[in-house]
């Protein structure tokens, strides 16, 4: 169970070590702690009910952090993308450059979130000395198909006939909606996440130089 060794036991070890030295712990988590069977955005007070091994391991990590270090900030986000590493957005960009049909998972809905924006939010939270669980995803909800279409448009390409829906990942419910409501962020007034389309446009413009 590699997922539990990394996401649960790893988080436990870091939480324990950070408490011993009196350090605040910032723990990054995911929308996958929810099963995606609802029809509304999920806020910090909704019960986490993961339906995948990954989601269960991430929730276990959250629980260890909450139990072992009271000075914690847990940040949940969704469909995070950045220049480095593999992610859904970069996969679509690569396929778009290669031409042909772009394959995306069917009936999955959430909010693509820029790692750059997410990092800016975390820095604001550090400065504000906030604790607890916060959702931090770009505003709005879309399907993976809609996200792929928007990526193509941002690249100056016509998405018509370019997207092929394929079966959802094994072990995940379908349809699946896990877009996060940034309720605590709005209550505290600390930060305002941008609309996912605006953040996507900025990201692709930055890639294109």
PLM region spans:
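Active-site "gating" loop of Rossmann-like NAD(P)-dependent oxidoreductase/epimerase domains
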Residues: 1, 9, 28-52
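NAD(P)-cofactor binding segment of oxidoreductase domains
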Residues: 1-26
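Conserved internal alpha-helix within the Rossmann fold of NAD(P)-dependent oxidoreductases
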Residues: 11-14, 62, 122
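SDR active-site strand-loop-helix element
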Residues: 25-31, 75-77
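NAD(P)-dependent short-chain dehydrogenase/reductase
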Residues: 63-110, 117, 123
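Mid/C-terminal beta-alpha module of Rossmann-like enzyme folds, strongest
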Residues: 121, 128-171, 176-177, 183
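C-terminal amphipathic/interface module of NAD(P)-dependent oxidoreductases
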Residues: 176-209
